[in-house]
Protein backbone atom coordinates (compact mmCIF):
# COMPACT_ATOMS: atom_id res chain seq x y z
CA UNK A 1 0.00 0.00 0.00
CA UNK A 2 1.37 3.40 -0.98
CA UNK A 3 2.07 5.63 1.99
CA UNK A 4 -0.28 8.59 2.40
CA UNK A 5 0.08 11.70 4.55
CA UNK A 6 -3.14 12.57 6.38
CA UNK A 7 -4.06 15.94 7.87
CA UNK A 8 -7.31 16.16 9.84
CA UNK A 9 -9.26 19.18 11.04
CA UNK A 10 -10.59 18.71 14.58
CA UNK A 11 -13.95 20.39 15.20
CA UNK A 12 -16.91 18.73 13.45
CA UNK A 13 -14.50 16.53 11.48
CA UNK A 14 -13.04 14.30 14.19
CA UNK A 15 -15.36 15.49 16.94
CA UNK A 16 -19.08 15.47 17.64
CA UNK A 17 -20.39 19.04 17.96
CA UNK A 18 -22.85 17.94 20.63
CA UNK A 19 -20.18 16.56 22.97
CA UNK A 20 -16.98 18.18 21.63
CA UNK A 21 -15.37 14.76 22.02
CA UNK A 22 -13.67 12.70 19.36
CA UNK A 23 -15.93 10.19 17.61
CA UNK A 24 -14.80 6.67 18.61
CA UNK A 25 -14.61 5.33 15.06
CA UNK A 26 -12.59 8.40 14.01
CA UNK A 27 -10.07 7.90 16.82
CA UNK A 28 -9.75 4.24 15.91
CA UNK A 29 -9.27 5.18 12.23
CA UNK A 30 -6.37 7.54 13.02
CA UNK A 31 -4.47 4.72 14.67
CA UNK A 32 -5.50 2.16 12.05
CA UNK A 33 -3.98 4.44 9.42
CA UNK A 34 -0.78 4.60 11.45
CA UNK A 35 -0.78 0.82 11.83
CA UNK A 36 -1.00 0.60 8.04
CA UNK A 37 2.14 2.74 7.70
CA UNK A 38 0.57 6.10 6.89
CA UNK A 39 1.56 9.47 8.36
CA UNK A 40 -1.20 11.01 10.50
CA UNK A 41 -1.35 14.64 11.63
CA UNK A 42 -3.84 17.18 12.90
CA UNK A 43 -4.30 20.41 10.90
CA UNK A 44 -6.09 23.06 12.96
CA UNK A 45 -6.37 26.74 13.70
CA UNK A 46 -6.21 26.00 17.43
CA UNK A 47 -3.23 27.27 19.38
CA UNK A 48 -0.64 24.66 20.29
CA UNK A 49 -1.57 24.47 23.97
CA UNK A 50 -5.21 23.86 23.05
CA UNK A 51 -4.34 21.34 20.35
CA UNK A 52 -2.22 19.13 22.60
CA UNK A 53 -5.02 19.14 25.17
CA UNK A 54 -6.98 17.28 22.49
CA UNK A 55 -4.22 15.18 20.89
CA UNK A 56 -2.20 14.02 23.91
CA UNK A 57 -5.06 11.92 25.35
CA UNK A 58 -5.60 10.19 21.99
CA UNK A 59 -1.91 9.68 21.25
CA UNK A 60 -1.50 11.76 18.08
CA UNK A 61 1.97 13.35 18.00
CA UNK A 62 2.14 15.16 14.64
CA UNK A 63 0.52 18.58 14.42
CA UNK A 64 0.03 21.49 12.07
CA UNK A 65 -1.63 23.93 14.45
CA UNK A 66 -2.00 27.66 15.10
CA UNK A 67 -3.44 27.92 11.59
CA UNK A 68 -0.25 26.50 10.08
CA UNK A 69 2.19 28.57 12.14
CA UNK A 70 3.23 25.73 14.44
CA UNK A 71 4.65 22.36 13.41
CA UNK A 72 5.07 19.42 15.79
CA UNK A 73 6.71 16.16 14.68
CA UNK A 74 6.70 13.13 16.97
CA UNK A 75 5.73 15.34 19.90
CA UNK A 76 8.56 17.86 19.37
CA UNK A 77 7.70 21.46 18.43
CA UNK A 78 9.80 22.41 15.42
CA UNK A 79 8.55 25.96 14.94
CA UNK A 80 5.83 28.37 16.04
CA UNK A 81 5.71 31.44 13.81
CA UNK A 82 4.19 34.65 15.26
CA UNK A 83 2.26 37.25 13.29
CA UNK A 84 4.39 39.56 11.11
CA UNK A 85 5.50 42.01 13.77
CA UNK A 86 5.20 45.17 11.66
CA UNK A 87 1.64 44.25 10.67
CA UNK A 88 0.73 43.34 14.24
CA UNK A 89 2.01 46.65 15.57
CA UNK A 90 0.19 48.56 12.83
CA UNK A 91 -3.11 46.85 13.70
CA UNK A 92 -2.71 47.77 17.35
CA UNK A 93 -1.84 51.39 16.52
CA UNK A 94 -4.98 51.63 14.37
CA UNK A 95 -7.07 50.14 17.18
CA UNK A 96 -5.66 52.61 19.70
CA UNK A 97 -6.29 55.57 17.39
CA UNK A 98 -9.89 54.40 16.90
CA UNK A 99 -10.44 53.94 20.64
CA UNK A 100 -10.97 50.20 20.23
CA UNK A 101 -10.06 47.75 22.96
CA UNK A 102 -7.62 44.95 22.17
CA UNK A 103 -5.88 42.04 23.84
CA UNK A 104 -2.84 40.09 22.67
CA UNK A 105 -1.61 36.52 22.96
CA UNK A 106 2.15 36.69 23.54
CA UNK A 107 2.99 33.06 24.32
CA UNK A 108 1.65 29.52 24.01
CA UNK A 109 -0.94 29.68 26.77
CA UNK A 110 -4.44 30.91 27.57
CA UNK A 111 -3.00 34.24 28.80
CA UNK A 112 -3.85 37.45 26.98
CA UNK A 113 -2.31 40.82 27.75
CA UNK A 114 -4.05 44.19 27.86
CA UNK A 115 -3.07 47.71 28.91
CA UNK A 116 -6.61 48.72 29.96
CA UNK A 117 -10.11 47.29 30.27
CA UNK A 118 -11.50 48.61 26.99
CA UNK A 119 -11.68 45.21 25.29
CA UNK A 120 -13.72 43.75 28.15
CA UNK A 121 -15.93 46.83 28.27
CA UNK A 122 -16.57 46.84 24.52
CA UNK A 123 -16.59 43.14 23.62
CA UNK A 124 -17.10 41.36 26.93
CA UNK A 125 -15.30 38.26 28.09
CA UNK A 126 -14.28 35.61 25.58
CA UNK A 127 -16.38 32.45 25.73
CA UNK A 128 -13.37 30.16 26.12
CA UNK A 129 -11.10 29.87 29.14
CA UNK A 130 -8.88 32.95 29.18
CA UNK A 131 -6.48 34.45 31.72
CA UNK A 132 -6.46 38.25 31.40
CA UNK A 133 -3.21 40.01 32.33
CA UNK A 134 -3.45 43.76 32.92
CA UNK A 135 -0.24 45.70 32.23
CA UNK A 136 -0.75 49.48 31.97
CA UNK A 137 2.86 49.83 30.78
CA UNK A 138 2.42 47.44 27.85
CA UNK A 139 4.45 48.78 24.92
CA UNK A 140 4.09 47.08 21.55
CA UNK A 141 7.40 48.55 20.37
CA UNK A 142 9.13 46.41 23.00
CA UNK A 143 7.29 43.21 22.08
CA UNK A 144 8.99 41.02 19.47
CA UNK A 145 6.45 38.19 19.12
CA UNK A 146 2.65 38.50 18.97
CA UNK A 147 0.75 35.31 18.16
CA UNK A 148 -2.84 36.56 18.16
CA UNK A 149 -4.62 39.90 18.43
CA UNK A 150 -8.25 40.33 19.42
CA UNK A 151 -9.82 43.71 18.60
CA UNK A 152 -13.25 44.76 19.86
CA UNK A 153 -15.38 45.84 16.92
CA UNK A 154 -19.03 45.47 15.99
CA UNK A 155 -19.67 43.96 12.56
CA UNK A 156 -21.47 47.08 11.34
CA UNK A 157 -18.43 49.21 12.18
CA UNK A 158 -15.99 47.31 9.97
CA UNK A 159 -16.63 49.43 6.82
CA UNK A 160 -15.52 52.48 8.82
CA UNK A 161 -12.11 50.91 9.46
CA UNK A 162 -10.56 49.73 6.15
CA UNK A 163 -7.34 48.85 7.96
CA UNK A 164 -9.01 45.74 9.42
CA UNK A 165 -8.26 43.94 6.14
CA UNK A 166 -4.50 44.41 6.34
CA UNK A 167 -4.24 40.86 7.72
CA UNK A 168 -6.51 37.82 7.60
CA UNK A 169 -8.93 37.56 10.51
CA UNK A 170 -12.02 35.82 11.81
CA UNK A 171 -15.19 37.42 13.11
CA UNK A 172 -15.86 36.12 16.63
CA UNK A 173 -19.11 37.73 17.73
CA UNK A 174 -18.23 41.14 19.12
CA UNK A 175 -14.56 41.13 18.16
CA UNK A 176 -12.05 40.30 15.42
CA UNK A 177 -9.47 37.56 15.83
CA UNK A 178 -6.18 38.11 14.01
CA UNK A 179 -4.11 34.96 13.77
CA UNK A 180 -1.90 33.03 11.40
CA UNK A 181 -4.23 31.49 8.81
CA UNK A 182 -2.26 29.35 6.37
CA UNK A 183 -2.87 25.70 7.11
CA UNK A 184 -1.89 24.75 3.57
CA UNK A 185 1.50 26.44 3.98
CA UNK A 186 1.94 24.55 7.25
CA UNK A 187 1.16 21.27 5.51
CA UNK A 188 3.66 22.06 2.75
CA UNK A 189 6.36 22.90 5.30
CA UNK A 190 5.66 19.67 7.17
CA UNK A 191 5.86 17.67 3.94
CA UNK A 192 9.20 19.28 3.14
CA UNK A 193 10.50 18.43 6.61
CA UNK A 194 9.51 14.77 6.36
CA UNK A 195 10.36 14.41 2.68
CA UNK A 196 6.93 13.27 1.52
CA UNK A 197 5.50 13.86 -1.97
CA UNK A 198 2.72 16.45 -1.88
CA UNK A 199 0.56 14.45 -4.29
CA UNK A 200 0.17 11.83 -1.54
CA UNK A 201 -1.34 14.29 0.95
CA UNK A 202 -4.94 13.70 2.08
CA UNK A 203 -6.84 16.40 3.99
CA UNK A 204 -10.17 16.17 5.82
CA UNK A 205 -12.28 19.20 6.73
CA UNK A 206 -15.80 20.50 7.23
CA UNK A 207 -15.84 24.30 7.39
CA UNK A 208 -15.15 27.26 5.14
CA UNK A 209 -11.91 27.95 7.00
CA UNK A 210 -10.71 24.55 5.72
CA UNK A 211 -10.90 25.80 2.13
CA UNK A 212 -7.36 27.08 2.49
CA UNK A 213 -6.00 23.52 2.73
CA UNK A 214 -8.06 22.06 -0.13
CA UNK A 215 -5.56 21.96 -3.01
CA UNK A 216 -5.62 20.36 -6.46
CA UNK A 217 -2.21 18.81 -5.90
CA UNK A 218 -3.59 16.32 -3.38
CA UNK A 219 -6.78 14.60 -2.19
CA UNK A 220 -9.29 16.80 -0.36
CA UNK A 221 -12.18 15.18 1.50
CA UNK A 222 -15.18 17.11 2.83
CA UNK A 223 -17.38 15.81 5.61
CA UNK A 224 -21.05 15.23 4.82
CA UNK A 225 -21.94 17.69 7.57
CA UNK A 226 -19.61 20.27 6.04
CA UNK A 227 -20.29 23.57 4.31
CA UNK A 228 -21.54 23.44 0.72
CA UNK A 229 -18.71 25.68 -0.48
CA UNK A 230 -16.18 23.15 0.81
CA UNK A 231 -18.02 20.20 -0.72
CA UNK A 232 -17.91 21.86 -4.11
CA UNK A 233 -14.12 22.08 -3.93
CA UNK A 234 -13.62 18.57 -2.53
CA UNK A 235 -12.42 15.53 -4.46
CA UNK A 236 -14.73 13.37 -2.37
CA UNK A 237 -17.59 14.00 0.04
CA UNK A 238 -17.91 11.39 2.77
CA UNK A 239 -20.64 10.83 5.36
CA UNK A 240 -21.33 13.04 8.34
CA UNK A 241 -18.83 13.12 11.18
CA UNK A 242 -21.28 11.36 13.49
CA UNK A 243 -22.05 8.75 10.81
CA UNK A 244 -18.43 7.51 10.82
CA UNK A 245 -17.54 9.68 7.83
CA UNK A 246 -13.80 9.61 8.52
CA UNK A 247 -13.68 5.82 8.71
CA UNK A 248 -15.97 5.34 5.71
CA UNK A 249 -13.82 7.57 3.49
CA UNK A 250 -10.67 5.70 4.45
CA UNK A 251 -12.39 2.40 3.70
CA UNK A 252 -13.68 3.75 0.38
CA UNK A 253 -10.17 4.56 -0.81
CA UNK A 254 -8.67 1.35 0.57
CA UNK A 255 -6.44 3.07 3.11
CA UNK A 256 -7.90 0.80 5.80
CA UNK A 257 -9.70 -2.50 5.30
CA UNK A 258 -10.95 -3.25 8.79
CA UNK A 259 -14.07 -1.85 10.46
CA UNK A 260 -14.32 -0.39 13.96
CA UNK A 261 -17.62 -2.20 14.51
CA UNK A 262 -16.39 -5.61 13.35
CA UNK A 263 -13.16 -6.10 15.25
State where each predicted segment sits.
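Asp-based, Mg2+/Mn2+-dependent phosphohydrolase catalytic module
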Residues: 216, 220-222, 226-263
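Hydrophobic packing residues within well-ordered alpha-helices of enzyme cores
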Residues: 51-55, 187, 214, 230, ...
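Short, structured coil segments at secondary-structure junctions
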Residues: 58-59, 67, 161-165, 216-217, ...
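Asp-based phosphoryl-transfer active-site loop
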Residues: 2-19, 214
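Short hydrophobic/aromatic-enriched beta-strand-loop microsegments
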Residues: 60-68, 81, 124, 169, ...
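Active-site phosphate-binding/coordination module
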Residues: 26-119
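Glycine-rich phosphate-binding loop signature in dinucleotide/nucleotide-binding domains
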Residues: 1, 38, 189-200, 253-260
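Conserved acidic, metal-coordinating active-site core of Asp-based
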Residues: 94, 98-101, 105-216, 225
Amino acid sequence: MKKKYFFFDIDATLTDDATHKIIPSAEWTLHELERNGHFVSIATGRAHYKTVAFTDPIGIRNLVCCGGACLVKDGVMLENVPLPIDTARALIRHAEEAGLGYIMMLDDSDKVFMKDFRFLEQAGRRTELTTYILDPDLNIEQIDAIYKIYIAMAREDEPNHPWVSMHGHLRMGSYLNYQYDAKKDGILRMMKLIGGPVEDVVVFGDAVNDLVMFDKRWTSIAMGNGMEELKQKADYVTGDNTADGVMRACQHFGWIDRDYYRL
